[in-house]
């Protein structure tokens, strides 16, 4: 994600995002059924994988969407991946956790409800989430390879948007899940979230840069240091993307 790229770049990594296929955070806040109001969340912990991760950003954004101040009103705990978060949720160590749409359908025997989703926001929360990332050196020396990769992923996005049943089979295969509701929700979310033209969100990248710089005083980083989506712009200008979608 853009947050990880920004953090790595602040630390000296020579990375650049060349395209972003999802430019927002596809997360919902899963909470215990006992939580009936926003007030019930205060003082109770929400679980994430690790600080700086997409789940961390999502937790903070969702808290603010509820009018709460992350950490101050609702502590954020690093508890690990999906399995660890589910275990912490079952035992009551955490009152909730951010989750991609549909994933909760895989958690059998866990009484829960969705309190808020980024899909509920009136304005899309800009965040470079699923992006093609490489080093500046590789992009300069293998630009044609990166161009062909981008073309293939634009075509794959079109396949996703137009071949529902086939796409659900791929989701089932690579997630190793066959829960019908999960597959349906996952597909519906992905169709909505994937951008037709995969430009990298400048607004979202700027926010992630500010977050990364706040963790490393004295460092400097600009959007243009970690974003080069010129290949996408070339493909759009050439008519390639329009041709794919005809």
What is each residue range found by the language model?
Residues 64-79, 91-94, 111-113, 181, ...:
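A local structural motif
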Residues 210-246:
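Conserved C-terminal helix/tail region of periplasmic/extracytoplasmic solute-binding proteins
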Residues 1-16, 26-39, 55-62, 83-88, ...:
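Pocket-flanking alpha-helical
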Residues 31-46, 140-143:
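Flexible hinge/capping segments at coil-to-helix
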């Amino acid at each position: 994600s853009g947050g990880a790229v920004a953090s790595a770049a602040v630390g000296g990594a020579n990375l650049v995002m060349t395209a972003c296929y999802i430019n927002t955070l596809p997360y919902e806040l899963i909470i215990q059924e006992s939580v009936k109001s926003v007030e019930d969340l205060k003082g109770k912990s929400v679980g994430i994988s690790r600080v700086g991760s997409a789940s961390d950003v999502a937790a903070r954004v969702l808290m603010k969407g509820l009018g709460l101040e992350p950490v101050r009103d609702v502590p954020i705990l690093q508890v690990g991946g999906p399995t660890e978060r589910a275990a912490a949720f079952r035992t009551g160590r955490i009152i909730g956790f951010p989750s991609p749409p549909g994933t909760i359908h895989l958690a059998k025997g866990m009484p829960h409800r969705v309190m808020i989703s980024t899909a509920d926001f009136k304005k899309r929360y800009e965040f470079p989430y699923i992006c093609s990332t490489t080093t500046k050196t590789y992009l300069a020396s293998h630009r044609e390879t990166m161009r062909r990769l981008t073309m293939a992923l634009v075509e794959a996005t079109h396949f996703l948007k137009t071949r529902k049943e086939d796409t659900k089979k791929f989701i089932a295969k690579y997630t190793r899940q066959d829960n019908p509701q999960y597959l349906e929700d996952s597909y519906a979310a992905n169709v909505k979230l994937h951008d037709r033209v995969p430009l990298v969100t400048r607004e979202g990248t700027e926010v992630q840069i500010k977050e990364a710089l706040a963790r490393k005083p004295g460092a400097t980083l600009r959007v243009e240091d970690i974003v080069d989506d010129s290949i996408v712009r070339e493909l759009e200008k050439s008519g390639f993307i329009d041709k794919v979608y005809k």
